[in-house]
Amino acid sequence: MPPLGPVKRNDLIYYLRRLDFEGPYSGGSHQFMMKGNTTIRIPNPHRGDIGKDFLIRILRQAGVNKKDWEKL
């Protein structure tokens, strides 16, 4: 169960796939993942983890609440 905090990019992709998102697909300057009509951009790989505030914004765009995220 992932805590709502910093997460590695690959872990974010793994958990989004567990939430039935497909991808990541190449597109423009960022990859993206899709679930139905919902499309979210995935941050480019960098040295550090994705911070808590940025993770919250990504999850909000994906329509994932804190409880669903922490149940994974």
Where are these regions (language model features)?
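Basic nucleic-acid-binding interfaces
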Residues: 1-27, 32-72
